[in-house]
């Protein structure tokens, strides 16, 4: 039975929904002012795994991931680039989709952009004003009245104090608001901007929404019954963003609830959270130029999703070598996947039972991955003397790997992709010719000539490996 750690209750809880129930999932998306970095990649790969596993168990999922396409960061970046917000945002969204496609992420069922929901946001603010949870400040901003929401802090067990920064307030002078931590719902502007992506008309004059009300309004619009089964995001969003979301949503609809709050750990680089603010971010594009997307996924899954991941090239290379070794075990195996094999069937197998036990324990992917490694070792062990068993094990490895989005390439194609990454065309042609020449000499049992070519390939940075069935090569 699946158990998931709920941030709200601080414990693992049984996920006991009926299989025919649609599971509503909302994950906070990207603010589109710059390239996506691997902190984003980790968060969305984690929720990709969660959704894949729920679907494997037989659940129907309805997955929403929003796009923040209006924000101070976007406005400032557009000014720096001397381009319109519209051009900047659309360019970043296009690159984001390209990155996510390369990472083989499941597409959300809905991907609402904030600017497409301005009317809904205005309606939400009207309701908060009506319910006495918001007010118009002296500078005409609309702010949330924090003192009136008595349950504030029940998700994170944290409260604001004067030393903390609520980063949706926009003035350094706080004397125009009731509480120093009241956050902005609507940012007033003196006039409509020429760039209509910046300001919109409202009953309170021209302006634009604050960050927290954007997610809350989108959730309120899509989940009419006021229930979200899984709400997720990075742990950095727990406070104040998700705390503020709850305050707004419950102030609009007192019956609003989230069944499971799931938060992923941060990616740490150079002793800080990976962030453009700290100038320590590594873009997804950079990583994809060096590593296959499945290697990146494997790297993330080797650390439990709730734990921080300390990024280093050294660890990434180590994970790459482990992953390549597993893929290599699939070479020359005949994989047959019976898609009709059900969940109960797998539970009867000891190794696979351990895999599902790990996944049912709060998506324990490090343990699940170690079991995949064990299957790979058994394939190697049986390849020579028990081909039948090796093929069954290889089929199991691919079957279980698919649940995690892994081992979906033909092994030979995988090694071609990995080998060819960032290599010049001329070098690849030379290597291919030498490799085929060596295979020819091996077939003729001309071992001396075969060894000479192996040494030449090594000088080109290529290692050739042989087994009892075939040969293959990889770049060092």
UniProtKB/Swiss-Prot annotation:
Its EC number is 6.1.1.16. One of its GO terms (cellular component) is cytosol. GO terms for molecular function: ATP binding; cysteine-tRNA ligase activity; zinc ion binding. One of its GO terms (biological process) is cysteinyl-tRNA aminoacylation. CDD domains: CysRS_core (cd00672). It catalyses: tRNA(Cys) + L-cysteine + ATP = L-cysteinyl-tRNA(Cys) + AMP + diphosphate. Binds 1 zinc ion per subunit. This is Cysteine--tRNA ligase. A motif ('KMSKS' region) lies at residues 273-277. The keyword Acyltransferase does not apply. It is found in: Cytoplasm. It is an enzyme of class 6 (ligase). The gene is cysS. It comes from Buchnera aphidicola subsp. Cinara cedri (strain Cc). InterPro entries: Cys-tRNA-ligase (IPR015803), Cys-tRNA-synt_Ia_DALR (IPR015273), Cys-tRNA/MSH_ligase (IPR024909), Rossmann-like_a/b/a_fold (IPR014729), tRNA-synt_1_cat_dom (IPR032678), tRNAsynth_Ia_anticodon-bd (IPR009080). Monomer. Belongs to the class-I aminoacyl-tRNA synthetase family. NCBIfam families: cysS (TIGR00435). It comes from the Bacteria. Zn(2+) binds at residues 28, 215, 241, 245.
């Amino acid at each position: 039975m699946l158990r998931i750690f709920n941030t709200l209750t601080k414990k693992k809880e049984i996920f006991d929904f009926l299989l025919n129930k649609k599971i509503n999932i909302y994950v906070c998306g990207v603010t589109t002012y710059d390239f996506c970095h691997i902190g984003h990649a980790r968060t969305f790969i984690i929720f990709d795994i969660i959704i894949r596993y729920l679907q494997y168990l037989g659940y129907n999922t309805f997955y929403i991931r929003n796009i923040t396409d209006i924000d101070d960061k976007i406005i400032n970046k557009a000014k720096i680039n001397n381009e319109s917000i519209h051009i900047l945002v659309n360019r970043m969204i296009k690159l984001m989709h390209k990155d996510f496609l390369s990472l083989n992420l499941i597409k959300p069922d809905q991907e609402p952009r904030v600017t497409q929901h301005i009317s809904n946001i205005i309606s939400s603010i009207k309701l908060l004003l009506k319910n006495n949870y918001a007010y118009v400040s002296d500078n005409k901003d609309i702010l949330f009245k924090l003192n009136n929401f008595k349950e504030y802090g029940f998700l994170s067990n944290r409260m604001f104090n004067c030393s903390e920064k609520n980063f949706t307030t926009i003035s350094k002078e706080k004397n125009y608001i009731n509480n120093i931590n009241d956050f902005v719902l609507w940012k007033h502007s003196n006039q409509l901007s020429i760039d209509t992506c910046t300001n919109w008309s409202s009953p309170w004059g021209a302006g634009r929404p604050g960050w927290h009300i954007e997610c809350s309004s989108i959730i309120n619009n899509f989940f009419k019954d006021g229930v979200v089964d899984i709400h997720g995001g990075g742990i950095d969003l727990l406070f104040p963003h998700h705390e503020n979301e709850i305050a707004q949503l419950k102030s609009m609809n007192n019956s609003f609830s989230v069944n499971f709050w799931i938060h992923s750990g941060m990616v740490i680089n150079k002793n800080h959270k990976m962030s453009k603010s700290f100038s320590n971010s590594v873009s997804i594009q950079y990583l994809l130029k060096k590593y296959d997307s499945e290697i990146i996924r494997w790297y993330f899954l080797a650390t439990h999703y709730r734990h921080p991941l300390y990024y280093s090239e050294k660890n990434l290379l180590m994970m790459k070598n482990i992953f390549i070794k597993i893929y290599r075990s699939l070479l020359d195996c005949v994989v047959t996947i019976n898609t009709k094999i059900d969940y109960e069937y797998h539970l009867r197998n000891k190794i696979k039972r351990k895999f599902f036990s790990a996944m049912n324990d709060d998506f324990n992917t490090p343990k699940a991955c170690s079991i995949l490694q064990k299957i790979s070792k058994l394939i190697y062990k049986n390849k020579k003397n028990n081909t039948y068993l090796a093929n069954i094990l290889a089929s199991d490895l691919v079957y279980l790997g698919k649940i995690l989005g892994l081992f979906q390439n033909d092994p030979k194609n995988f090694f071609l992709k990995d080998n060819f990454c960032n290599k010049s065309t001329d070098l690849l042609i030379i290597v291919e010719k030498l490799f085929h020449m060596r295979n020819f000499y091996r077939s003729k049992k001309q071992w001396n000539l075969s060894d000479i070519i192996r040494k030449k390939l090594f000088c080109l940075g290529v290692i050739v490996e042989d087994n009892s069935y075939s040969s293959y090569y990889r770049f060092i």
